[in-house]
Amino acid sequence: MSLKEKTQSLFANAFGYPATHTIQAPGRVNLIGEHTDYNDGFVLPCAIDYQTVISCAPRDDRKVRVMAADYENQLDEFSLDTPIIAHENYQWANYVRGVVKHLQLRNNSFGGVDMVISGNVPQGAGLSSSASLEVAVGTVLQQLYHLPLDGAQIALNGQEAENQFVGCNCGIMDQLISALGKKDHALLIDCRSLGTKAVSMPKGVAVVIINSNFKRTLVGSEYNTRREQCETGARFFQQPALRDVTIEEFNAVAHELDPIVAKRVRHILTENARTVEAASALEQGDLKRMGELMAESHASMRDDFEITVPQIDTLVEIVKAVIGDKGGVRMTGGGFGGCIVALIPEELVPAVQQAVAEQYEAKTGIKETFYVCKPSQGAGQC
């Protein structure tokens, strides 16, 4: 049963009438450009064919009812007429409440809604299940009540909800690619202007995501420390963000910086340059150059930004040994576990899957999860 059929059926059972709309918003994988988003830099993600799906209908009162199919059909209910506060027990509900509250704060006028939510974006894997949920909820209200919001505004609203209501300092990339993704393309995003450029993906190349299944948490983790270190670096250069610092400026005074901060800054500056170059390599179908840039990105995350773990490095090495210079592989996401992403010619996928199955668990004691994805369309009706 598809997520659409599942949520429509649950909706009718739970609420006693049929849903009027079904909305989807995809998860994402970032091909290159890690931790650059909150430094006003560049990222190159693509939306993937794993998504959050919401069957919904408008109500004629001011009540919001939300059922989470993936959490034993837990039900959250709140009113649009009283201040929206955090749910004491259901963390999933806070993503919904946060999005609704921030849409209100943006002076959008809308009525009540019934929703049933289900998704297949793996959670805790760094594939943006939370951003996909935020964008899906924002798109539901935009569609049901014809709100004057474009994809970028729905994305910004989701980011605000996660930063201020849920309490995680995420950048804008995850929500933006979920809202604006384009089938068969990656999206080069300028995280300062929010300008996007669709970059066509080479034919015959699979986007493979392998979850290390080494558990990670983002809220309250090292993520926020890295962000502070980057802000310290920007202050040292008296710039609003590291986006405004050149490699030459950095090299001239790197020795004056705290050594740890210097490493963090170097990662961001070199990663930005790699990301812009990667977009052209991808567009030209130059998988060899793309692979080199992904390898440099991984080394920089491992040695300068220090966000990889041995399990992730092992996975990258196993894949690299199979694909050589025919594709690319690196850690993706916030770090400290999660997933690696690989761009691999389709004919090499079985060999990669076999090598990983034979070696990863033997070396780490953890069984991986293997996903072959297609670059997919952003949020909308399904």
From Swiss-Prot:
It catalyses: alpha-D-galactose + ATP = alpha-D-galactose 1-phosphate + ADP + H(+). ATP binds at G124, A125, G126, L127, S128, S129, S130. GO terms for biological process: galactose metabolic process. Keywords: ATP-binding, Carbohydrate metabolism, Cytoplasm, Galactose metabolism, Kinase, Magnesium, Metal-binding, Nucleotide-binding, Transferase. Pathway: Carbohydrate metabolism; galactose metabolism. One of its GO terms (molecular function) is magnesium ion binding. Mg(2+) binds at S130, E162. It is found in: Cytoplasm. The record marks R28 as: Transition state stabilizer. Substrate binds at E34, H35, T36, D37, Y223. Catalyzes the transfer of the gamma-phosphate of ATP to D-galactose to form alpha-D-galactose-1-phosphate (Gal-1-P). Belongs to the GHMP kinase family. GalK subfamily. HAMAP family: Galactokinase (MF_00246). This is Galactokinase.
